[in-house]
Amino acid sequence: MYKIRRGLGFFGFTLLVIVLFSACANNVSRNLTSSAELLPSQCRIVKHIMGETCVPINPQRIIAASDSTLEAALILGLKPTGTTTYAQQSDYLRERFESTASVGLDSRLLSLEKILTIKPDLILATDDYGEQQELYNRLSQISPTVIAKWWDGKNIRWKECFQLFAQAFGKTSEAEKIVNAYNQRIAELQQRMGDRLQNTLISIIEIYPDRIRLFGKTKTVSLSSTIIEDIGLPRPPSQEEGMDISLESIGDADGDIIFLMARDPEAQLYQQVMNHPLWKQLKAVQAGKIYKVENSYWGGSGYIAANLVLDDLFKYLLK
């Protein structure tokens, strides 16, 4: 008898769990459907890597699910309702807005529960990890979602992403002014450098706690290396493609000027590089042309960071 009662009890408990789960699932499904529906007159069509999305004309509750989407929103005068923890850790962005709701660590670890709580009317994301289909399938059930292609296999596409985000925000006129101002600064720097422009080899290096990275023209690139390319400054032959190098290959980091980023200046590897005989033999080191720059914006993701990089370039290249 005891065994029969226990079996019935277990069956009843299981049935209760199924009923509750189904009720919750139906409730979430209703929330998802109602959140994603928009009348054609209330939205604009935006084309992106996952197809076309009808986004609201004047979005009020925006989820910026990456640092590049957050940066685009901020420079265009918008404050997202939610973003990732990772995006909020960028010093140069954190200075420009008050804390906002976190919807997960990064685009791979988004909390759908937190996003549902915000009830967004627009979600922007990038395919940072090549998982755009899964990402889109999840997010587009909640709200109109636009996903930009960040990496094309050789370079980051920060400018193209910005244009797409501006279109989604309905801020294309403002975006054009930002792009024009950037291009004007590039032209000014080119003009002021004169003949030095074609005769100054620029090296970009970052020392992590566990590796040394050269940022090249393709493959392992950063926002700063694309800006150097925009200006037309030459790179050392060893930096056509970015890569990680060993301490014994530190000679590949040489140039007329070295811009140096360091994740942790107290780390053992950083100290080893600074004290290594091969480092001390570099032309830029001997000429005193090593300039330490901030990795947060030299490795940034939009026009806020780009202008901070240009500030550094005006400062150091026109000495």
PLM-predicted stretches and their roles:
Residues 87-92, 213-242:
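Alpha-helical, coiled-coil/dimerization segments enriched in small aliphatic residues
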Residues 66-114, 127-128:
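A short, structured surface patch at a secondary-structure boundary
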